[in-house]
């Protein structure tokens, strides 16, 4: 951990103790922890670093435990990313430390932060699970060290809770200003919680640039032993500039070969994209053939887990509102628990010569939860007939009756057009958790 980051978190915790901190409610995540309390499983809180995992566990959930009768000496907290607890990264030392604190038969709550910093952490967690009066919670910032291990090592005894940067509604609740100003702020700088207390533009920009290079990208490079730092750095820039557009590793490789005379193979590029996804920096949206009811492996789309980080990577240039809106909607849907794909509808149309040709129309998002499905288009506006047709044509060729929604920029309340499609403003969508059920 960087010294300035350590000092920041120390200050954050001290401020919280004084009662002066702006508390951002994260009730959805807190309720998930409460629902899973004492269920005999390891609760694994995952997500990008600095998105609020530690605050959720060590502040909000600990406060809940204390307010509901748990004694402070029955809550064992260990933050494994700090230099002051370096010795506890040794699995045997950590396990012994915890065991020594368990001195009676009452329930103990073990809170371990950034558990991937400990070698063989799976063995420690499995050992803790064998203690009857222990309830274990851990956080981690890399899915390869967590999600796969949850499945293989815990054999059904791991319960993953995914945390995202602040949604707009969470951000707005702490912003203290008007919607339009908050929306501009969010679209530029994103939803990392630390930004809430920053007062000027330069401070926010410097923070986002610094944390990307010195924390996120550095973690990816070091964990995966990447030798050529320049190549993956440029790859990140390419992905940042191409949010919402199909990504082809072979084409990227060819670009490196012709423009940089670099042998950056498509296999290496694919592996590096996987590393970025495992670190929760980006998220993959699969392409789904709606008529054929099958997935298409080629030309996947990638979105950044936070638009502020994406913008920082490009020095706050290339601020295309529609693509940024699309990224925000994608992240919002994930945070609400939907699975999200990019839809494709194949149609036969006549070209300017009157010949029938096959054409692929796109649906920005196909979202699913349980038996429910929604088709969603994201548009900056629908002010012209041409723009309306562009968004509606895909819907017209979908052979089912699931709800079809267009989200547009602005504050308009939802309404239905003559074809039954729901049109709603971004404000309504973001600030109403059940907005898709209008």
Question: Where do the language-model regions lie?
Answer:
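Walker A/P-loop nucleotide-binding motif
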Residues: 40-58
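Pre-Walker A adenine-sensing motif
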Residues: 19-38
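Conserved catalytic/switch belt of AAA+ P-loop NTPases
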Residues: 122-138, 152
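Conserved P-loop NTPase "ATPase switch" module shared by AAA+ and STAND
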Residues: 103-121
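A cross-kingdom feature that marks ATP-driven nucleic-acid transaction machinery
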Residues: 1-22, 46, 55, 66, ...
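Conserved ATPase-coupling elements of RecA-like P-loop NTPase cores
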Residues: 87-90, 116-125, 148-150
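Interdomain motor-coupling "hinge/lid" segment immediately C-terminal to the ATP-binding subdomain
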Residues: 2-16, 141-143, 148-246, 250, ...
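Short glycine-rich substrate-engagement loop in P-loop NTPases that contacts/grips substrate
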Residues: 76-105
């Amino acid at each position: 951990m960087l010294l300035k980051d350590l000092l920041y978190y120390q200050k954050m915790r001290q401020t919280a103790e004084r009662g002066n901190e702006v508390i951002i409610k994260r009730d959805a995540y807190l309720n998930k922890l409460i629902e899973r309390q004492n269920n005999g499983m390891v609760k694994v809180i995952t997500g990008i670093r600095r998105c609020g995992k530690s605050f959720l566990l060590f502040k909000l959930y600990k406060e809940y435990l204390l307010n509901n009768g748990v004694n402070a000496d029955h809550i064992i907290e260990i933050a494994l990313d700090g230099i002051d607890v370096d010795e506890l990264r040794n699995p045997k030392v950590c396990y012994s430390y915890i065991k020594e604190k368990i001195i009676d038969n009452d329930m103990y709550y073990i809170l371990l932060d950034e558990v991937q910093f400990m070698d063989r952490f799976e063995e420690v967690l499995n050992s803790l699970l064998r203690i009857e009066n222990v309830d274990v919670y851990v956080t981690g910032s890399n899915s390869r060290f967590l999600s796969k291990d949850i499945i293989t090592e815990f054999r059904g005894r791991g319960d993953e809770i995914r945390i995202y940067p602040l949604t707009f509604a969470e951000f707005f609740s702490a912003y203290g200003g008007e919607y339009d100003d908050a929306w501009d702020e969010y679209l530029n700088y994103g939803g990392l919680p630390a930004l809430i207390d920053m007062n000027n533009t330069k401070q926010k920009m410097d923070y986002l640039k610094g944390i990307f290079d010195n924390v996120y990208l550095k973690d990816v490079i070091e964990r995966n032993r990447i030798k050529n730092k320049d190549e993956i750095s440029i790859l990140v820039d390419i992905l940042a500039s191409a949010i919402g557009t199909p990504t082809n590793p072979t084409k990227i490789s060819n670009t490196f070969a012709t423009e940089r005379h670099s042998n950056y193979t498509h296999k290496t590029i694919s592996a590096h994209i996987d590393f970025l996804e495992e670190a929760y920096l980006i998220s993959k949206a699969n392409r789904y053939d709606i008529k054929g009811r099958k997935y298409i492996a080629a030309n996947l789309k990638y979105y950044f887990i936070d638009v502020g980080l994406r913008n920082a990577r490009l020095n706050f240039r290339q601020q295309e509102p529609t693509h940024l809106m699309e990224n925000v909607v994608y992240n919002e849907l994930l945070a609400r628990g939907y699975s999200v794909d990019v839809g494709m509808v194949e149609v036969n149309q006549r070209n300017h010569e009157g010949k029938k040709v096959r054409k692929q129309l796109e649906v920005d998002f196909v979202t699913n939860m349980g038996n429910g499905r929604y088709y969603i288009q994201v548009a900056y506006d629908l002010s012209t007939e041409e723009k309306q047709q562009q968004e509606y044509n895909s819907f017209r060729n979908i052979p089912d009756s699931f709800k079809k929604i267009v989200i547009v920029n602005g504050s308009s309340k939802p309404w239905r057009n003559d074809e039954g499609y729901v049109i709603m403003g971004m404000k309504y969508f973001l600030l109403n958790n059940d907005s898709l059920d209008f």
